[in-house]
UniProtKB/Swiss-Prot annotation:
Taxonomic path: Bacteria, Pseudomonadati, Pseudomonadota, Gammaproteobacteria, Enterobacterales
Name recorded for this polypeptide: Catecholate siderophore receptor Fiu
Domain of life per record: Bacteria
Gene Ontology cellular component terms for the protein in this record: cell outer membrane
SUPFAM superfamilies with a match to the protein in the record: Porins
UniProt motif (TonB C-terminal box) ranges: 743-760
Residues in TBDR plug domain copies: 67-175
Residue ranges of every copy of the TBDR beta-barrel domain listed in the record: 180-760
Gene giving rise to this polypeptide: fiu
GO function terms (MF aspect): siderophore uptake transmembrane transporter activity; signaling receptor activity
The organism of origin for this protein: Escherichia coli (strain UTI89 / UPEC)
Length: 760
């Protein structure tokens, strides 16, 4: 493990590869620049280059009024073309184009994460996922069939969206009707019985009206994982009125249904760094790894969810420079699941004989039955104007939002132990039955914000923004009395066993002030340097709508605790080269997170904890030539505890689930009019694992490289095929690991996906 910890070889290779890429681009840029100058000297008219399909020039969120190249933040925009070329069908797969971002954490103890459980720069970002700038609640997997582009903003986003994760946010932009008619359809088959079909129909009606319909159906097994299946269907109709006029109305609806088999992972026995949890179980030190195909759940396990979202947006151009928008959205995400996972540790192992093939491990049933709802109305005004010689690019607005969550209490499910090496899933514990011990959370928010970019001179810009949030959170929860184990309560006199008893009933109100400020200087027409500073806050209950009583306990949701606060400073540079077809960026960053909960010497808890994430990131997106496209990046990040208890398994101050080095690159080349080839590579460095007193579990996950490839063939203007190969060299790796380290999710083996794309 020591080599993986210090990365002497892997670090060199990834840095050398990316440095070589950048060095290789330089002479090309110089040559094209010289050619452009020669054309200018000959007074020829040179047409502007076609924007790259791999590098959208503008965020679709009106809060970001400047082009991506002039935004003083680290921002990656993953276009629809990238998603199509890679065959990425969900958000987690699309985010593989962003270095250091991924689903690295597999949950705590017996609990396992579901859906898009994203970590970014040392923090859980799964509750900072937005659709069209509006928070999307729920631990579900988000399909990309109705997605125009994915925008990843690193650093605090509190000024942009209110309470959020301290290190970044993710915004999925929905497809909208457009003023041209066409039909796009796809049919895919692949490894592990993968079957998927999509339909995208856009039809113009009259001069200013258009309708659009996106449909998706998918059914597949998880490659390399027995018994794990996924099935989802979606439909997204929309209509637009007033296209091309000063008044536009958009109506959208989204419905997605999923029927999946959750995966609790497999034991870490045999992984580097594993040792038996006790002397009596020492045979596990030499018994080898379990088969990665093993399924430790039951045939009754399920993860069902339904998403319904209705949106109305009205836009009015007051004049050529000023637009007002009003968006109303109602959304509901319902999810219920029964997920079985193993319980590691010596006390959970049963040894009928000395043969490890007869040993069993305890299983636990994780359950969830939850309904999330959001109702919001947002008004935004954008305007460009001058005050004297100073130009202004303003975005301002107000937001009213109500978010509610109900966690329905369910009766516990008891499961038999499972054989460590030969698990049997033919167990039928039945479904979930509600017991009335529910938890209800509601947060009402009123927010007002204002951003302005000031053009001081032709080359120098200042920008700033402030957001004020007034929030009120109410929370109550009940427990079925008379149970056993952690959190059990006795029944009050006269109350029957199993009856719900309210244990928490509290509320919290407050105000949040988030702000950001930056400056940008254009060194040339194509390149700039910038600095930025931003402050973001997350109040108690802001992450999960749950509150805890004041005065005792280590929950960050205690009503007497202050909001978590993040301060980020960034200095960077962005360059548009090769006739502005290719965007190169580099940035140094530091995020300090304050008000973390820590234990005092007397056993009480205070908010003196501090964390820090710092490092640098470089990225590339766009076209090297009209036929050669790429997107990628590299980051080095150091995430540590600055004040408080160390949480890594090895006792160091490092934050877990954060690769110190990460690299990603995807490149595609149009070899002929009909043939295209693509290839990509990703590197995720070794990561520390969290600690909860587990004995013998790996302290690190090993770093790994994964390569992908694509071959495309165009039959005619109406039909083309593409073959995607994932994990080309069939690399074995740990995709995610849980906090105790007793179980992990293996990475997907080599798989194939063949897609027929039709255009009319």
């Amino acid at each position: 493990m020591e080599n993986n910890r210090n990365f002497p070889a892997r670090q060199f290779h990834s840095l050398t590869f990316f440095a070589g890429l950048c060095i290789g681009i330089t002479p090309v840029a110089q040559a094209l620049a010289a050619e452009g100058q020669a054309n200018a000297d000959d007074t020829l008219v040179v047409e502007a280059s076609t924007p790259s399909l791999y590098a959208p020039q503008q965020s679709a969120d009106p809060k970001f009024s400047r082009p991506v190249a002039d935004t003083t933040r680290t921002m990656t925009v993953i276009s629809e073309q990238v998603i199509k070329d890679q065959g990425a069908t969900n958000l987690t797969d699309a985010l593989k184009n962003v270095p250091g971002v991924g689903a690295f954490f597999a949950g705590e103890n017996g609990n396992s994460t579901t859906g898009d459980a994203i970590y970014m720069r040392g923090a859980d970002t799964s509750n900072s996922i937005y659709i069209d700038g509006i928070r999307d609640i729920g631990s579900v997997s988000r399909d990309t069939f109705n997605t125009e582009q994915v925008e990843v903003i690193k650093g605090p986003s509190g000024t942009d969206y209110g309470r959020s994760a301290p290190t970044g946010s993710i915004n999925m932009i929905s497809k909208q009707p457009r003023n041209d008619s066409g039909i796009d359809a796809s049919a895919s088959i692949g490894s592990a019985w993968f079957r998927r079909g999509t339909l995208d129909v856009n039809q113009v009606i009259g001069d200013t009206t258009a309708v659009r319909l996106n449909v998706m159906g998918e059914k597949t097994h998880d490659a390399g994982r027995d018994k794990v299946k996924n099935e989802r269907y979606g439909v997204a109709p929309s209509v637009a009125f007033g296209l091309g006029t000063a008044n536009r109305l958009y109506l959208n609806y989204l419905h997605v249904t999923q029927h999946n088999t959750p995966d609790g992972g497999i034991p870490t026995i045999g992984l580097p760094g594993y040792s038996a949890p006790s002397a009596g179980t020492a045979a596990l030190n030499h018994s080898g790894k379990v088969d990665t195909h093993n399924f430790y759940g039951t045939d009754s396990d399920y993860d069902d969810s339904t998403t319904d979202t209705a949106t109305m947006r009205f836009e009015h151009d007051i004049n050529d420079n000023t637009t007002i928008r009003n968006t109303t959205r109602w959304s509901r995400v319902k999810q219920d699941y029964l997920m079985t996972a193993i319980m590691g540790g010596a006390s959970n192992i049963t040894q009928p004989t000395s043969d490890v093939n007869s040993w069993t491990w305890s299983r636990t049933a994780n359950t969830k039955d939850v309904s999330n709802k959001i109702l919001t109305n947002q008004t935004n005004l954008t305007s460009t104007f001058y005050t004297g010689a100073i130009g202004h690019d303003v975005s301002t607005g107000v937001e009213f939002t109500r978010e509610t969550q109900t966690n329905y209490g369910v009766n516990p499910v008891t499961l038999p132990a499972v054989n460590i090496y030969h698990p049997d899933s033919s167990i039928h514990p039945g479904g979930l039955t509600r017991n009335g011990a529910n938890a209800n959370g509601q947060t009402d928010t009123f927010a007002i914000y204002a951003f302005d970019t000031l053009q001081i001179t032709r080359d120098f810009e200042l920008n700033g923004g402030i957001r004020l949030d007034n929030y009120h959170t109410e929370y109550d929860s009940a427990t079925a009395c008379g149970g056993s184990g952690r959190g059990a309560i006795t029944c009050p006199a006269g109350v029957a066993k199993g009856s719900p008893v309210t244990t928490v009933d509290t509320a919290k109100s407050g105000n949040l002030v988030n702000w950001k400020a930056g400056a940008l200087y254009h060194l040339t027409e194509n390149g700039n340097i910038y600095i930025n500073y931003a402050v973001s806050q997350q109040p108690p209950g802001g992450n999960n709508f749950a509150l805890a009583q004041s005065g005792s306990g280590n929950s960050a949701n205690r009503t007497d605790f202050k909001p978590q606060k993040a301060n980020t400073s960034e200095i960077g540079t962005k360059w548009q080269v090769l006739d502005k077809r290719l965007l190169l960026t580099a940035a140094l960053f530091r995020t300090d997170i304050e008000n973390e909960v820590e234990q005092n010497d007397d056993g009480t808890y205070s908010q003196y904890g501090k964390k820090r994430v710092e490092g640098y990131e470089i990225s590339v997106a766009g076209n090297i030539t009209p036929a050669w496209q790429m997107i990628g990046g590299y980051t080095q990040q150091k995430a540590t505890i600055k004040n408080g208890k160390d949480v890594a398994q090895d006792g160091s101050s490092s934050l877990p689930y954060t690769p110190e080095h990460a690299f990603t690159l995807w490149s595609q080349y149009q070899a002929t009019d009909d043939i295209s080839v693509g290839a990509g590579a990703r590197y995720i460095g070794s990561m520390h694992k969290g600690s909860d007193g587990a004995v013998g579990t790996p302290a690190f996950t090993e770093g790994y490289w994964v390569a992908d490839a694509k071959l495309g063939y165009r039959v005619n203007r109406n039909l083309d095929f593409q073959l995607n190969v994932y994990n080309l060299f069939d690399t074995d790796y740990v995709a995610s690991i849980n906090k105790s380290g007793y179980r992990y999710h293996p990475g997907e083996p080599r798989t194939f996906l063949l897609t027929a794309n039709m255009h009319f």
